């Protein structure tokens, strides 16, 4: 459980000179907060049609989302460790699933950002034949499983962690429910009906609200109780 303060994010001068647990928790909170912002900005500027014709924007958007994913992974560690002793097996399972999902997703983003545009420019037929174009579904069963596994684990993992935090009242319920709703919508996005997928702005706002809110509260932690 954490208790928050209404003052600035910085602590005492002596504490700020050392990487105390409190400072590390604050950094985790800031990482989560920034992860939501970077991922959302990256999503909004991402060209969803063709990489070669929008190479600069395509690369910039992916770098933002990759940065958001890395910060999310770092912040996730602090988010879990602060309340680890109270969360039990469900919380641990959620943390591990969410961490694995982010690693899988970062691998997919690396391919999409740096390798896909080069292959698409040289052999577009190869990309289309395997269903690797934006909005397409991979043809190969193994690739399809990996493609869907990342976002599904993200939804399940973060939802389990969020519900565990809700059970021990680690954060205000509205913030946790916003986080849970956001990760479920983002994680299960590939499986949702087209009508829901068209509400990308709404989904992004819900997710960003939840992850930024929780990150802000974690960054303002006054006392850390494991």
Task: Please report, for each region that a protein language model flagged, where it lies by residue.
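Hydrophobic, aromatic-enriched alpha-helical segments typical of multi-pass transmembrane helices
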Residues: 2-226
């Amino acid at each position: 459980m954490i208790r928050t303060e209404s003052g600035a994010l910085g602590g005492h001068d002596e504490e700020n000179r050392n990487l105390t647990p409190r400072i590390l928790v604050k950094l985790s909170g800031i990482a989560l907060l920034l992860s939501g912002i970077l991922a959302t900005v990256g999503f909004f500027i991402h060209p969803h049609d063709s990489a070669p014709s929008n190479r600069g924007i395509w690369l910039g958007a992916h770098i933002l989302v990759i940065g958001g994913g890395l910060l999310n992974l770092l912040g996730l560690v602090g988010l879990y460790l602060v309340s680890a002793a109270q969360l039990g097996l469900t919380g641990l399972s959620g943390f591990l699933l969410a961490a694995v999902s982010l690693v899988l997703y970062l691998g997919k983003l690396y391919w999409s950002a740096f390798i896909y545009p080069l292959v698409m420019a040289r052999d577009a037929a190869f990309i289309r034949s395997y269903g690797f174009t934006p909005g397409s579904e991979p043809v190969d069963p193994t690739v399809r499983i990996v493609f869907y596994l990342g976002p599904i684990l993200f939804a399940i993992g973060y939802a389990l962690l969020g519900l565990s935090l809700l059970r021990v009242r680690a954060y205000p319920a509205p913030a946790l429910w916003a986080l849970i709703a956001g990760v479920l919508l983002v994680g299960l996005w590939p499986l949702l009906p087209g009508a829901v997928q068209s509400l990308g702005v709404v989904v992004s706002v819900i997710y960003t609200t939840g992850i930024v809110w929780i990150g802000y509260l974690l960054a303002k932690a006054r006392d850390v109780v494991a």
